[in-house]
Amino acid sequence: MSNSSPETVSQPSQEVKYGEREIAEGQLITFPNPRVGRRYDINITLPEFTCKCPFSGYPDFATIYITYVPDERVVELKALKLYINSYRDRYISHEESANQILDDFVAACDPLEANVKADFTPRGNVHTVVEVRHTK
């Protein structure tokens, strides 16, 4: 049994948590493609994307699907997860979030092809899917 009083346990801490720090410091990291010259697809699903509507401030939820054909670099998955988590408190539209993710992804790994699909959870009886593409 803990000696902590309920008041102590429920007090919000001003200390930055390690996960928050990793998200804030996160950037897309890449490593060398182990099979340069071989054309293959990498499919990534990120089911916990969140951001905030720039008009209402309400949270938006989406599953982000990234499919790409690597050239010389491959994206490291933990770094990608932290990058995606950095959108949590950003006020950004569905359209801009999908485009920004693609722009940053292409800048990081310069793939031969990339596709980002943002499938947003319906809100107010509206279901939005934004799909953007890049071809080298």
UniProtKB/Swiss-Prot annotation:
InterPro entries: GTP-CH-I_C/QueF, NADPH_dep_7-cyano-7-deazaG_red, QueF, QueF_type1. Disulfide bonds: none annotated. Pathway: tRNA modification; tRNA-queuosine biosynthesis. It is found in: Cytoplasm. GO terms for cellular component: cytoplasm. One of its GO terms (molecular function) is preQ1 synthase activity. It is an enzyme of class 1 (oxidoreductase). Its EC number is 1.7.1.13. NCBIfam families: QueF-II. This is NADPH-dependent 7-cyano-7-deazaguanine reductase. It comes from Nostoc sp. (strain PCC 7120 / SAG 25.82 / UTEX 2576). The gene is queF.
